[in-house]
UniProtKB/Swiss-Prot annotation:
Coiled-coil residue windows: none
Biological source species: Shewanella halifaxensis (strain HAW-EB4)
UniProt protein name: Peptide chain release factor 1
Region listing for Disordered, in residue ranges: 285-305
Pfam families named in the record: PCRF, RF-1
Family: Belongs to the prokaryotic/mitochondrial release factor family.
Length: 361
C-alpha cells in the first residue's frame, strides 16, 4: 500500500483515539449537540479503524512468517510457508477493503429518503405496475426493518397508482435506494388482454434524500404559493368536508408538491414542505454534480430520471439491470422485495467507478 495511504490511515487512527477520549469528557457529555456530532464521527471511523488494525496485525504476522521461513527445522519451515501464504492473501483482501472505506462518502447516504413512483407510458397497466413497484419497495423496507410512510397517492382507475410518494426511514436508507432512480419498464400480458399479447409499460422512480432540519436550505415564504383543497379517496365521513389537502408551488423552480394522506391540514403542510425541501435540494445538488462531473464517467449514479435502467419481463421471469448488464431469472422473488441481488452490485459498480476516477486523478 502507498505510503501516503498509510499516513492517512494512521491519521484516522489517531483521530479515532482523540474522539474516544472526548466522548468520555464530562463537558462534552453535557453538550448534547457536540456529543451527538462526535458520536457520529466515531461511528463513521469505526469500520476503517478496525480494518486498518487488522491490516497492521496481518503485516506483523507476514514479517514473522518470513523470518520463520529462514529456520532450519523442516516442520517449522512448512508452517511458516502456510502462514506466509495466508497472511499475504489477508493483506491483499484488507488493502482492497481499505480502498473502499477511504472512498469519499456521500453525506446523504445515512439519510432517510422520499421515493416517488409515477406511471408513464402504458395507461392502466403502467398504474398497476407502479403499485407493484411500491409493494416491492415496501417489502424491501420491511425486510430491513425500515419504516415506510405514505405521503401522497393518486390512485389508478383499475388499481395501482398514477403517482405515489412515500417516506422511508431507517439506517442507511438513501445509500441503499439511491440507484433506483430512473425508468423501470415492464413486459407482461395484462389481465384485460384477451389475445395473450405482451404489452410494454413504464414507470419513473425518483429517490431523494430527506434533508435534515439543521441542514435544510432556507425557503423564502414569499416564493411559495399554497393552495388547499378537499382530499379525495378513502376516508369515510371525513372526506370532502374540510380542505385538508395541501398543494405548494415553489415559484422560482416551478416545483409542485401535493399532500393529502393526513387528515390534518397542518400535517399535510409539514409533509409537503419536507418533500419540497428535498426536491429543491436535489435540483441544487444536480447543478453542482453536473459542474463537477462534466468530464467524468459515472455509470450508475448519472441521475437521469428518463433513462431506462431496468426491465421486468414476466413471461421469462427475468429482471435485467441495464446499467451493469446484469440479468437474473428470479422475478417473483424480486417483486416480493428481495432486491439486494441488484442493489449491492450497483453499489459495488459505483465504488469501482470512484476507484477508477481516483486512479486517473
Amino acid at each position: 500500500m502507498k505510503d501516503s495511504v498509510i499516513r492517512k490511515l494512521e491519521g484516522l487512527l489517531e483521530r479515532n483515539e482523540e474522539v474516544l477520549a472526548l466522548l468520555s469528557d464530562a463537558s462534552i457529555i453535557a453538550d448534547q449537540e457536540r456529543f451527538r456530532a462526535l458520536s457520529k464521527e466515531y461511528s463513521q471511523l469505526e469500520d476503517v479503524v478496525r480494518t486498518f488494525k487488522s491490516y497492521q496485525q496481518a503485516e506483523e504476522d507476514f514479517e514473522s512468517a518470513k523470518e520463520m521461513m529462514e529456520e532450519d527445522d523442516p516442520e517449522l519451515k512448512e508452517m511458516a510457508q502456510e502462514e506466509y501464504k495466508a497472511t499475504k492473501e489477508a493483506i491483499a483482501t484488507l488493502e482492497a477493503e481499505l480502498q473502499i472505506l477511504l472512498l469519499p462518502k456521500d453525506p446523504n447516504d445515512d439519510n432517510n429518503c422520499f421515493i416517488e413512483i409515477r406511471a408513464g407510458a402504458g395507461g392502466d397497466e403502467a398504474a398497476i405496475f407502479a403499485g407493484d413497484l411500491f409493494r416491492m419497495y415496501s417489502r424491501y423496507a420491511e425486510s430491513k426493518r425500515w419504516q415506510i410512510e405514505v405521503m401522497n397517492t393518486n390512485e389508478g382507475e383499475h388499481g395501482g397508482f398514477k403517482e405515489v410518494i412515500a417516506k422511508i426511514s431507517g439506517e442507511g436508507v438513501y445509500g441503499k435506494l439511491k440507484f433506483e432512480s430512473g425508468g423501470h419498464r415492464v413486459q407482461r400480458v395484462p389481465e384485460t388482454e384477451s389475445q395473450g399479447r405482451v404489452h410494454t409499460s413504464a414507470c419513473t422512480v425518483i429517490v431523494l434524500p430527506e434533508v435534515p432540519e439543521a441542514e435544510a436550505i432556507e425557503i423564502n415564504k414569499a416564493d411559495l404559493k399554497v393552495d388547499t383543497f378537499r382530499a379525495s379517496g378513502a376516508g369515510g365521513q371525513h372526506v370532502n368536508k374540510t380542505d385538508s389537502a395541501i398543494r405548494i408551488t415553489h415559484i422560482p423552480t416551478g416545483i409542485v408538491v401535493e399532500c393529502q394522506d393526513q387528515r390534518s391540514q397542518h400535517k399535510n403542510r409539514a409533509q409537503a414542505m419536507s418533500v419540497l425541501a428535498a426536491r429543491i435540494q436535489a435540483v441544487e445538488d444536480e447543478k453542482r454534480r453536473s459542474a463537477e462531473e462534466s468530464t467524468r464517467r459515472n455509470l450508475v449514479s448519472s441521475g437521469d430520471r428518463s433513462e431506462r435502467i431496468r426491465t421486468y419481463n414476466y413471461p421469462q421471469g427475468r429482471v435485467s439491470e441495464h446499467r451493469i448488464n446484469l440479468t437474473l431469472y428470479r422475478l417473483n422473488e424480486f417483486m416480493e422485495g428481495d432486491i439486494d441481488c441488484v442493489v449491492e452490485p450497483l453499489i459495488q459498480e459505483n465504488q469501482a467507478d470512484m476507484l477508477a476516477a481516483l486512479g486517473e486523478a
